[in-house]
Amino acid sequence: MSDRLNDQAQNRLQKLLNLKQTGNDPYLITKIENTHSAASFQKAFANQSDAELKQYQVILTGRIIALRQTFIIIQDFSGKMQLYINKKTAPELFEYFNNYIDLGDQIVATGHPMMTKTGVLTLNVERLQIVAKCLQTPPEKWHGLTDPEARARKRYLDLTYNRAQVEVFLKRTQIITAIRTFLNEAGFLEVETPILQAVLGGANAKPFKTHYNALKGDFYLRIANEIALKKLIVGGLPKVYEMGRMFRNEGVDTTHNPEFTSIEMYQANADYAVMMDLTENLIKFVCKTLNQWSFNWNGQTLDLAKPFKKVKMVDLICQVTGVNFDDVKDDQTAIALAKQHKVELKKHEQNKQHIINRFFEQFCEHTLIQPTFVTHYPKAVSPLAKQDPHNPEFTERFELFINTKELANAYSELNDPLEQRARFEQQLQEKRMGNDEASELDESFLDALSFGLPPTGGLGIGVDRLVMLLCECSSIRDVVFFPQLRELK
């Protein structure tokens, strides 16, 4: 505790010291066997007569959220309960209440149920004990924690005084359970792959780096688990998925957290079209589980019941900007178009394929409100995807956008080890030109491919973003228990 306590905190601390001196140390209590939760208390006794209620002995536990005269309101995970202390029939109990109890204290109370004159089911307390003293003043009852950063920084208070936030996390758990149920029923095997990786790969992103003392080498926290999962397909597993944490050493904003939850799945003898159907069916299964198909986001109504739209990237660019990249035959023409449309390019982006991707990011992403599969990404930005047999500049790849945000990324997996090596070498060239998100050459993965990866479809879904959408939350902080925050100084 700080030496500079305010008056209220000092008073609370003194009450704790007094409790200990009188032999009532709350921290010596190791176990509580309550008979009811708030919800089960209401369900069990709300419709019984006074005579019937007096027959029961009930033990309740919870945190005090309101005090008024001889009434206490406590809260547990299931709801709220009212307690009553009769100062005439239980003077010693009232003295304990008066001398030691504060808002925020965790207590255990024993007594019998009763109905007040106003018809409120209440516990008539016969024994009362603090089990954890609240030594700081809790948030004000009606306004609580309102600052979003303070809520995320002190999630333990946010969950106590903001029931709506609790409901978000309950829904998050329901969504994750539904995803697993869908995949398990579809015959996918849940697996675990390494978080520490010697070679960077599986996505284009900046990594976190650490040093592995025992192996005397630098390792990365994984930016994706794609490579390891595809090795399992080479090993003969037909359908695999993994849900877990990924780490990307990049910016923090309302839709990005450096540590995030993602799910990736791979299916042998499938392509990107199969994964497209899988994506839509999975999301609709989750909506069915939630019994909700329409979602509101910044004034937009998103309808997930209708079939998801499909559009090629170059067609969408043409619709939005009027530029038809199918007619562009060389890099110089593409560079001129980028300059004309004020599209800034990095050194490694001075070519048609990267410019197509930059046009899409700058002009098209923000137009994608209803669920839309954007297909056929340029090969230069898809180093692990199989090229389109009808147009080798592009790949059999899609990303799903809903309300301008990317939720899923999938493709027909490149399974030609010679072509994959050439793609990796192209990525190394881009890295030398300043692309710090480029993949590294992964000899272990190339070795696995050389033993034969069957045609495979792969899919990754950002779980946090999906939860944001389905919980109608505007910030990723609201759907992550403990988001990364800048250190207070």
UniProtKB/Swiss-Prot annotation:
A molecular function GO annotation: ATP binding
Assembly: Homodimer.
Binding site for Mg(2+) 2: E406
Protein name: Lysine--tRNA ligase
Listed HAMAP family: Lys_tRNA_synth_class2 (MF_00252)
Coiled coil stretches, renumbered: none
This enzyme's EC code(s): 6.1.1.6
Cofactor(s) of this protein: Mg(2+)
Species: Mycoplasma pneumoniae (strain ATCC 29342 / M129 / Subtype 1) (Mycoplasmoides pneumoniae)
Biological process annotations from GO: lysyl-tRNA aminoacylation
EC class (word): ligase
Gene Ontology cellular component annotations, sorted alphabetically: cytosol
Note accompanying the cofactor annotation: Binds 3 Mg(2+) ions per subunit.
One Pfam match: tRNA-synt_2
